């Protein structure tokens, strides 16, 4: 992990410089306060109230919140860079630092937009389920001829869904998280290296105090933007299932304290402590194993449960067909199956709408990132002057 205790040593000097610069420059302090608020909002979006502690969001909802956060921070950084634009265009190293940041934002955008593939899969899966339910209603009324063939059309529709694998698989979102996080980690390293080069230049050249101040502000804004993206990305990965929920504290405490974000750290720590108390109570009640399983459930629908329901339905209908003997039919089992089919329809439609909403929001945030990155890079090349 990039922000491990060992690796944090590489960033310690830059973090101290950032904290010092915040004290020297009110505008940078204002930037920092705004960034802290955005991060606090993100933490709260991943958690319930203080009574229940830290509870992971569904992967698709977490993906939306993380993309929104990246877009907002990107916009915030862009505003500051544009405000000090004339200094950026004068120095090749500072210009390279800005280019590195926004080119990485564009790469992250490309990864984020892959969510559209999952949206399309979810829509196709929804169509198969809706078709299966409609076919079930038709088959149920079909009382002619061989009853052993009665629900074969329904089975055929369910098998189409099964053949897709699992279009609602939350692991697909986690895969995208990992790719985005890896790009953020790479960016942080490149920003650190370029910033160190810039710091050396500042020591060895004569320049006006006002220009030196602007160099310092810009380089610190870019560094902390990249640093926070990695810290937040670590939290998102944990909250979406890569590690236990309480592990977030260990992952984020060090970097949050290092940048002086005591308030943000306190918010996170309170959530973690509430969660730990909750788990301790569950241990005493001998229900901790069940609770840990629930920690990965979505608010209303487990993304993986839909495929499980389809498999169970297919087995149930197959069993019904096998149980038919001449003119005898298991009516009770049929009623039960109908209820499950109706429940499944509601589940899959609701989840598909959620995923479609994520796709719409990600597209909106991606457009924000693309536009701000383009605007800044255009300024750097001189075409936007």
Swiss-Prot record:
Family to which the UniProt record says this protein belongs: Belongs to the UPF0496 family.
TM region positions: 217-237, 242-262
InterPro entries: DUF677
GO cellular component: membrane
Coiled-coil residue spans: 138-214, 267-294
Tissue expression per record: Widely expressed.
Main location: membrane
Keywords from the named record: Coiled coil, Membrane, Transmembrane, Transmembrane helix
Protein name (record): UPF0496 protein At3g28290
Membrane topology of the entry: Multi-pass membrane protein
Subcellular location: Membrane
